Amino acid sequence: MTVLNTTDKRKADDTVNKLDGKLKQPRLDNFFKTNTSSPALKDTQVLDNKENNSVSKFNKEKWAENLTPAQRKLLQLEIDTLESSWFDALKDEFLKPYFLNLKEFLMKEWQSQRVFPPKEDIYSWSHHTPLHKTKVILLGQDPYHNIGQAHGLCFSVRPGIPCPPSLVNIYKAIKIDYPDFVIPKTGYLVPWADQGILMLNASLTVRAHQAASHSGKGWETFTSAVLQVALNRNRKGLVILAWGTPAAKRLQGLPLKAHYVLRSVHPSPLSAHRGFFECHHFKKTNEWLEEQYGPEKCINWSAVSEQKAKIKSSELESSSTE
């Protein structure tokens, strides 16, 4: 399948297309000397520039003082677990009827059903990829719905969990772009998120063993707002990886002019053979990031292979109780 770029023919896109035609298969170490994954950012950490220092001063508790007791109960999870820069940017969404209705639905689900991912992981994407660090957006659809898999990042599974078929195909595609890439034994993609890849599903929760069971409940409206914020806040542009028809539809109506959109079929075994392995999205992502931001901002796809993933006791506990 031919990869479609954003319809706005930007100069940077032209540069990438030219590079794509004349560059040989690069090595990952051409982009990096050393790259190690960092832990999830916490709200108390000092952010690394003036803009983010102002964001870090946002006081969730002061904001929450104006909530009614009922609203506070519904929104306690967001207050406790959503990273501050994202919370500040999205706070107007929380009091909209659709979001309060979504939270009422989830309250009932948690009382009577097994729901994935665990509550504390629903917004893990916001800590691994704070708003100011976002440079790539990877669009997912639905969290994994089997025990021990989902932890808040699309396509990623917990350490020790076998790689799902779609992720296996993602690794194969990276190997085509970068022949020296070592196929990881883990599907734990936190090192990618820590480098600035916002790994965002359309729906952030799912009922156990029932795919798409929380679709149409309000998450899609919220995650669309997340995308809107990310795209509007980054004037130099982001890379957007949209795999499959649902991902492409999520981009409709969004401000894409400044951004580099890469579309392809989904990496699922049902569709990957129709062009995913030939899309070269991983190489193109780095070529564009290097052109826009410099080589130090490229993604080290091998960081997943290089990580020494350890299953924390909390992860073991949550996996065993899901």
UniProtKB/Swiss-Prot annotation:
Could you state one GO cellular component term attached to this entry?
Answer: nucleus
Tell me the active site.
D142
Looking up InterPro entries in the UniProt record yields: UDG_fam1, Ura-DNA_Glyclase_AS, Uracil-DNA_glycosylase-like, Uracil-DNA_glycosylase-like_sf
* The reaction(s) this protein catalyses: Hydrolyzes single-stranded DNA or mismatched double-stranded DNA and polynucleotides, releasing free uracil
- GO BP annotations listed: base-excision repair; base-excision repair, AP site formation via deaminated base removal; mitochondrial DNA repair
Q: What is its main location?
A: mitochondrion
Q: What HAMAP family does this protein's entry cite?
A: UDG (MF_00148)
Q: Where in the cell is it found?
A: Mitochondrion; Nucleus
Query: Which cysteines share a disulfide bond?
Result: none
Q: By its UniProt entry, which PANTHER family does this protein fall under?
A: URACIL-DNA GLYCOSYLASE
Which Pfam families has this protein been placed in? UDG
Q: What is this protein called?
A: Uracil-DNA glycosylase
Q: Decide whether keyword Transmembrane is in the record.
A: no
Q: Which family does it belong to?
A: Belongs to the uracil-DNA glycosylase (UDG) superfamily. UNG family.
**The organism's taxonomic lineage, starting at the top:** Eukaryota, Fungi, Dikarya, Ascomycota, Taphrinomycotina
Instruction: Quote the SUPFAM superfamilies the UniProt record gives.
Output: Uracil-DNA glycosylase-like
EC no.?
3.2.2.27
Biological function: Excises uracil residues from the DNA which can arise as a result of misincorporation of dUMP residues by DNA polymerase or due to deamination of cytosine.
Give the keywords, sorted.
Answer: DNA damage, DNA repair, Hydrolase, Mitochondrion, Nucleus
Q: Which GO terms describe its molecular function?
A: uracil DNA N-glycosylase activity
Top-level enzyme category? hydrolase
